[in-house]
Amino acid sequence: MLEPKRTKYRRPHKVSYEGKAKGNKYVAFGEFGLMATNGAWISNRQIESARIAISKALGKTGKMWIRIFPHLSLTKKPLEVRMGSGKGSPEKWVAVVKAGTVMFEVANIPEEVARTALKNAGNKLSVNWKIVKKGEIAHD
């Protein structure tokens, strides 16, 4: 699972996923990419299951890039605990994905295989998505 080795603060403020992405908007490394069309938090478990789905379809010649990383820790208080007395303990790590962010990229495989691999990966994520080509500007 992906998670940071060290963080400056254990329990950060919540980061909003509203609005459009500023960076990470184009396919930079591969030939095809999986782009988010709305914002959401993507957990490290979702990223891992999408990675496995892509790597099953890639084979030995294909290459994959994961362009998101779960930097944000989400906290939760235990069940049946009264309000107050501080913030809860960190429960899971999430990546903040805004609309227009390219999350995964693949290369060195035929287009049909790339589309099925990215489709299988997209179905594992809690965000709406579309498949984009390198050099293609995706308008919302």
Swiss-Prot record:
The keyword rRNA-binding applies. InterPro entries: Ribosomal_uL16, Ribosomal_uL16_bact-type, Ribosomal_uL16_CS, Ribosomal_uL16_dom, Ribosomal_uL16_sf. GO terms for biological process: translation. GO terms for molecular function: rRNA binding; structural constituent of ribosome; tRNA binding. Keywords: Ribonucleoprotein, Ribosomal protein, RNA-binding, rRNA-binding, tRNA-binding. It comes from the Bacteria. Binds 23S rRNA and is also seen to make contacts with the A and possibly P site tRNAs. PANTHER family: 50S/60S RIBOSOMAL PROTEIN L16, LARGE RIBOSOMAL SUBUNIT PROTEIN UL16M. HAMAP family: Ribosomal_uL16 (MF_01342). Part of the 50S ribosomal subunit. This is Large ribosomal subunit protein uL16. It comes from Malacoplasma penetrans (strain HF-2) (Mycoplasma penetrans).
